[in-house]
């Protein structure tokens, strides 16, 4: 995957001086043990680092300032071992600009009935310490994540891991840069939007570059690099010449590889992590990037067609959250409305990411009427089965809104010999009719990101971090 930086999360434990130095030493010892065992569990995608026992407004404020300016720190996990007066947390929490997880847990997972005394009660006050702390977060309208349960349970560790992925995506969002080659498809409404507001709210930079600038990079790719990649791909994918001559198949496939290298170099040299193309503006290119775009998406670059920069940025963002697993640019295309068979066939002209392929992708070359260029090479495959979420973002003028519904992914009932593209069949879990009407009522777009690796809870957490309206259509 296109790499993100190495992140860590800081663990801050709440207490106070009221209980004495011996108790505070026990608090620190227990907190460090929790951190060590969380890291040793191998369930978390990023390391946790014990930072301090928070006892005063001053040291809480100082640690939150450190979190803000340390680019390596993706967020804070707090735990109240004892009672920790929440007035001490006000200033630091107000200043915190990164994701906050309140882990409402206890060092032991049981009550030691035979030995419990008031010393034990003073030390293990998470039950009401968490309530004091949660109140001030609610009072400050912090919208932070809360996970309650025993820290050693695998289910709780999985919840922490999912939140970590969201927090890292949030941090990485402010570095997402989208290059749009040409503008969006003419006269289309839903792919438009306020780029300035997107940069203010999400950190997304969206830049226009002319196709001629890309053509220079594409033409500069060496034949040696293209030939080497072509031979490598023969080992990973099925090459199907079909009705094409061997010469045409090889030339058209190699041209897509040329576009792949050209796009990749263009983006890497300028710091872009997502891109869009537009079939209406391909001057100087032999083909609409198809296989090229699919190869780049497989590496973790965000993409959307027709100049849809919002979906391209969202694709990159959710790929980060999913570690680039089974998370793809998608488009609703055609419907099965037979009773008992209701489904949506999703696809695009060419550009669907092979990370959801249920079979070995085939490299094929076929005509594409749209765009007026040479027959483009593309990956052809059938999508996977399983639970997924279909996500889109739209700009309503006064706000951005994120929306999704849960879907069941299925394979197509039959092959589609006259539709040589990547495709995915799915049905909204609430039923096609209810899902469609909910989506249309909200004005959700036709370009989406479909993911088998993230869920609606993570989308809600992400929206809370951004202060973004999120609708989970049910």
Swiss-Prot record:
GO terms for molecular function: L-arabinose isomerase activity; manganese ion binding. PANTHER family: L-ARABINOSE ISOMERASE (PTHR38464:SF1). Its cofactor is Mn(2+). Its EC number is 5.3.1.4. It comes from the Bacteria. Catalyzes the conversion of L-arabinose to L-ribulose. Keywords: Arabinose catabolism, Carbohydrate metabolism, Isomerase, Manganese, Metal-binding. One of its GO terms (biological process) is L-arabinose catabolic process to xylulose 5-phosphate. It catalyses: beta-L-arabinopyranose = L-ribulose. Pathway: Carbohydrate degradation; L-arabinose degradation via L-ribulose; D-xylulose 5-phosphate from L-arabinose (bacterial route): step 1/3. One of its GO terms (cellular component) is cytosol. Mn(2+) binds at residues 306, 331, 348, 447. Binds 1 Mn(2+) ion per subunit. This is L-arabinose isomerase. InterPro entries: Ara_Isoase_C, AraA_central, AraA_N, AraA_N_sf, Fuc/Ara_isomerase_C, Fucose_isomerase_N/cen_sf, Lara_isomerase. Belongs to the arabinose isomerase family.
